[in-house]
Amino acid sequence: GAATIGKAIAVASYNAASRFTNLNGSTYDAGVGETGDISNFSSHGPLVGEATPKPAVAGPGGTVLSAFSKNSAQFENYRSYQVQKVNSEGGTYYYGMMSGTSMATPAVTGIIALWLEANPKLTYENILDIMKATGRRDNHVGKVDANNWNATWGFGKIDAYNGLKKA
């Protein structure tokens, strides 16, 4: 996949929540693992033969709130995941719980974009250095090597605010 490209930033996923309550009041176990822990679907590194450690960082990807399109053919199949309904400007908009590295990656990408807005001269290496210096390493992340990295979490959980201060 794309995570194997030399200067791609591979993102692991951790769980923002492990349970949720939908619009009907039913509570579900999201099936992703414990809140704050690595998501059970997240791949582990390192990429063999690669000088750049992968994953670089972990972002929230397990049980996160996302927009649902009522125009999607799958909309009815995901009713049990819908947790918010917003009426605005004549339209009704739905939000629900989703999981995947496809949720974690856009979160991390948006954070990096914020850093680049603060400092457009940041390089790939600078971004990795910021992740290395500011990644949150809690009890879930556990032990890291001399470079603050491990094969499950990369440099830890991305920290948007402290990274922005470093940018």
Question: Where in this protein do the model-derived segments appear?
Answer:
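Zinc-dependent metallohydrolase catalytic domains
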Residues: 145-157
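Catalytic-core segments of hydrolase enzymes
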Residues: 1-68, 134-135
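Hydrophobic alpha-helical scaffolding
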Residues: 1, 27, 31, 47, ...
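Hydrolase catalytic cores
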Residues: 55-148
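Secreted peptidase-domain scaffold signal
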Residues: 157-167
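Short glycine-rich loop/turn motifs that provide flexible caps or phosphate-binding loops at active sites
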Residues: 12, 44, 58, 99, ...
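Generic recognition of stable, solvent-exposed alpha-helical segments in well-folded globular domains
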Residues: 6, 33-36, 103-110, 126, ...
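Stable alpha-helical structural segments in soluble proteins, enriched in small hydrophobic residues
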Residues: 8-13, 104, 113-114, 163
